[in-house]
Swiss-Prot record:
It comes from the Bacteria. Its main location: membrane. Belongs to the ATPase gamma chain family. This is ATP synthase gamma chain. It is found in: Cell inner membrane. One of its GO terms (molecular function) is ATP binding. F-type ATPases have 2 components, CF(1) - the catalytic core - and CF(0) - the membrane proton channel. CF(1) has five subunits: alpha(3), beta(3), gamma(1), delta(1), epsilon(1). CF(0) has three main subunits: a, b and c. It holds the Pfam family ATP-synt. One of its GO terms (cellular component) is proton-transporting ATP synthase complex. The keyword Membrane applies. It comes from Nitrosospira multiformis (strain ATCC 25196 / NCIMB 11849 / C 71). The lineage of its organism: Bacteria, Pseudomonadati, Pseudomonadota, Betaproteobacteria, Nitrosomonadales. One of its GO terms (biological process) is proton motive force-driven plasma membrane ATP synthesis. InterPro entries: ATP_synth_F1_ATPase_gsu (IPR035968), ATP_synth_F1_gsu (IPR000131), ATP_synth_F1_gsu_CS (IPR023632). Keywords: ATP synthesis, Cell inner membrane, Cell membrane, CF(1), Hydrogen ion transport, Ion transport, Membrane, Transport.
């Protein structure tokens, strides 16, 4: 009976854990829907500012912004790694960090220096443990991040590129595909590639040539637009990463709940067999005693 009591305690413990994982699954599902809405709402702004940046980069040929200039040699690289602040989201953080570390090792093998900006507690902790050169970070941003809290961290890299401290800047994050699929990606953030701007020179359905009147002059306007555009790219990546995080957490908690159910079934079967064996033994002892009398 001591064995049966121990099994009952295990069943009770697993059931309590299952209640927690089911609650976390429902919370993650609710947060996932809100994160997807924020992700969709951020896209129109990104598209509009990309249209403006694309046109201005072509229309005003007297000035070429540093973000558009390709460096002859690449010796110093800045990377932005976007992860979650919390765990229990499957392999989401592991996959993007594995990709980042793989690229970092390849660059270091070529003699390139790497400096890191971390967005998210998980990435910051990992990079600090591996001894990476972390120059800035933004953590505990919550499920609805404010761009203002990001600017301080990413401004260090943007200013560094302007000052020739970096030759390239890359962005690592998890792209949201659908509820069941998210994939880690690496994108070149700076210099801005033609692929990013090529399709955005003119809005769909609009004809004719754009022309702007700059007040007081074009250079400060272009400088500001380019910075805002890069910030929009990073913010869009962050919203996709949050949507991916909540989706991965919902799937992970559902899997945990299902596994808990399987464990409960197995323990219940073991308990029933143990109880049956104990009853059979008692009956055998009673029958044996009666026969002896």
């Amino acid at each position: 009976m001591a064995g049966s009591r121990e099994i009952r305690n295990k069943i009770k413990s697993v059931k309590n854990t299952q209640k927690i994982t089911r609650a976390m699954e429902m919370v993650a599902a609710s947060k996932m829907r809100r994160a997807q809405e924020r992700m969709k709402k951020a896209r129109p702004y990104g598209e509009k500012i990309r249209n403006v940046a694309a046109h201005m980069s072509r229309a005003y040929t007297e000035y070429r912004h540093p973000f558009l200039i390709e460096r002859d040699t690449v010796k110093r690289i800045g990377i932005i790694v976007v992860t979650s602040d919390k765990g229990l989201c499957g392999g989401l953080n592991t996959n993007v960090l594995r990709m980042a570390v793989s690229k970092m090792k390849a660059w270091e093998a070529e003699g390139e220096q790497i400096e890191v900006c971390c967005i998210g507690n998980k990435g910051l902790g990992f990079m600090n443990r591996m001894g990476a050169n972390v120059i800035s970070h933004a953590v505990s941003l919550g499920d609805a991040p404010d761009l203002e809290r990001l600017i301080g961290a990413i401004k260090i890299l943007l200013d560094g590129y302007n000052q020739d401290r970096f030759d390239r800047v890359y962005l690592f994050y998890t792209r949201f595909i659908n509820t069941m699929k998210q994939e880690p990606v690496m994108e070149q953030l700076l210099p801005l590639s033609d692929e990013r701007l090529r399709a955005s020179d003119r809005p769909t359905g609009q004809r004719g040539v754009w022309d702007y009147i700059y007040e007081p002059e074009a250079k400060p306007v272009i400088d500001d637009i380019m910075v805002r555009y890069v910030e929009a790219l990073i913010y869009q990546a962050l919203t996709e990463n949050i949507a991916s995080e909540q989706s991965a957490r919902m799937v992970a908690m559902k899997a945990a709940s299902d596994n808990a159910g399987n464990v409960i079934n197995e323990l219940t079967l073991i308990y029933n067999k143990s109880r049956q064996a104990a009853i059979t033994k008692e009956l055998s002892e009673i029958v044996g005693g009666a026969a002896a009398v």
